[in-house]
Amino acid sequence: RWASRNAAFVDLMVRTGLRLTEQASLLVSDVPEISGRGYSRFWLSGAVAKWGSARWVYVPASVLSDVSAYVDIDRQSVVRMARSRGDYEGSTQAVFNRESGFVTTVIGDGVLARTRVGNLSPTERLRLMVESDEGLEPAALWLSETGHPVAVSTWKDLFRQANARCVAKGAKLHAHAHLLRHTFAVLTLEQLQRGHIAELSKLLPEQRSQYVRV
């Protein structure tokens, strides 16, 4: 079960170029609907993105399918078990309304404050709960075996553990989150170069010579 969650997490990272903290703080509501197109997209807010670099993030259909399967099966399973244990009872300090996009926070003595979810930091997002007919559950996309949000430090540990297993098995493999982002950059550059070469091939020899001189 958790191998499939981890695989979906890694595939999403290497195919989108998201940083570890950015991806670890995603909410279920960030996951776009599966469409008939090759890519779907979601908006990464400046409060989450490093250096405030808000942007559209494009997710390949195959990766989105795996993430959606995790949400519908593995994630839902741990949420049900956590509810049955009463883990979420009373967790109403910060409740996120997915329809309005606002978070209602209890700031003391019953006083409520409302803010847009897009203004929250990664740490604040991991504290959010959502309420449905079935009850409360974390708003976070990535949940642990106990049904609680997976911290950034835990993801780093998972990479370290995977690298240690590779060493123990004699496999010459090593990976970390930043390497996946570099891989995304290299693959994207290669695709751009292929597209550029394909466009050049459509030009007449005279046009190509003018392009070279420029």
Walk through the language-model features, giving the residues of each.
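Alpha-helix-centered segments that form part of catalytic cores
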Residues: 1-7, 119-143
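Active-site/pore-lining binding-face segments in mid-to-C-terminal subdomains
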Residues: 56-72, 81-89, 139-140, 155, ...
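Conserved tyrosine-mediated DNA breakage-rejoining catalytic core shared by Y-recombinases
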Residues: 25-130
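A short, glycine-centered helix-capping/turn motif at helix boundaries
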Residues: 12-25, 191-195
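Short, cationic motifs built from Arg/Lys/His that form the positively charged side of catalytic pockets
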Residues: 5, 19-20, 50-55, 181
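Basic, Lys/Arg- and aromatic-enriched nucleic-acid-binding interface segment
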Residues: 1-20, 207, 211
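Short, basic (Lys/Arg/His-rich) helix/loop patches that form interaction surfaces
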Residues: 128, 148-149, 156-213
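Extended hydrophobic secondary-structure segments that form protein cores and membrane-embedded regions
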Residues: 42, 139-144, 176-177, 211-214
